[in-house]
């Protein structure tokens, strides 16, 4: 047995080592997204965000009628009164993470949600529910919500593309859930920053993305089921919920 008395602790066999190139790429993307988040939207961007919001709203109302969404919505009754975010399809309010879970599930229920072809994802199904839930809890104005959405879409697209898009599927993971967590976390970070009257920073985004990565989920097993698996619908809800939590945990200094 080797005795270590000084210096850094010994590395475990097979322990991952941070790739400098990946660290640099993450910092570069975070810096870009921070600039997007802190800049006012152009007229064209504002109109695009409004259309995405309207599209998500209509699709989600339809999706809220599906049995899986209704069951999860009713399951959230135990969380009624835990927050100020409306839970879609119910008459109660709950913590933003719970509201985002239900809304995200509804948004992805009919495969009519928006699609980013390169990263094989449905950004709005994860980003918009998370942003709306946090916006409700923080009483954010529409302008702040739209800016948060723009930053969330930018982050999800860039991070998803850098991760390889289809490669994620080949490894057995559902991109909407995995990448959606990052986009949702970004949008929520923006809303929290605006509420505090602060700028979105690169380091804060990186912290939130670290928590999003730690929660990454969504297996492609549903695609192997003979009749398909409706758990796929919940994957967007997971992405939305994880993003809300990632943004909150990014502000906890001891949780890094």
Question: Where is each model-derived feature located?
Answer:
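N-terminal core-entry segment
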Residues: 3-256
């Amino acid at each position: 047995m080797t005795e270590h008395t000084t210096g850094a602790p010994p590395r475990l066999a097979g322990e991952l080592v941070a790739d400098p190139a990946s660290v640099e790429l993450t910092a570069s993307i975070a810096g870009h997204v921070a600039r997007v988040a802190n800049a006012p939207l152009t007229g064209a961007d504002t109109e695009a965000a409004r259309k995405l919001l309207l599209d998500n709203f209509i699709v989600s109302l339809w999706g809220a009628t599906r049995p899986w969404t209704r069951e999860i919505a009713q399951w959230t009754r135990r969380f009624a009164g835990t927050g100020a975010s409306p839970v879609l399809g119910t008459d109660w309010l709950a913590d933003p993470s719970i509201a985002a879970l239900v809304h995200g599930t509804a948004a992805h229920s009919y495969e009519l949600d928006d699609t980013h072809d390169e990263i094989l994802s449905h950004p709005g199904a994860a980003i918009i529910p998370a942003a709306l839930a946090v916006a409700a809890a923080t009483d954010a104005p529409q302008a702040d919500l739209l800016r948060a959405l723009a930053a969330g879409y930018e982050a999800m697209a860039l991070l998803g593309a850098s991760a390889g898009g289809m490669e994620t599927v080949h490894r057995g993971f559902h991109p909407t859930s995995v990448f959606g967590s990052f986009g949702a976390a970004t949008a929520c970070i923006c809303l929290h920053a605006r509420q505090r009257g602060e700028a979105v920073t690169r380091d804060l985004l990186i912290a939130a993305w670290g928590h999003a990565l730690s929660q990454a989920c969504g297996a492609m097993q549903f695609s192997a089921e003979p009749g398909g698996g409706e758990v796929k619908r919940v994957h967007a809800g997971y992405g939305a919920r994880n993003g809300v939590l990632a943004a909150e945990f990014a502000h906890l200094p001891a949780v890094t």
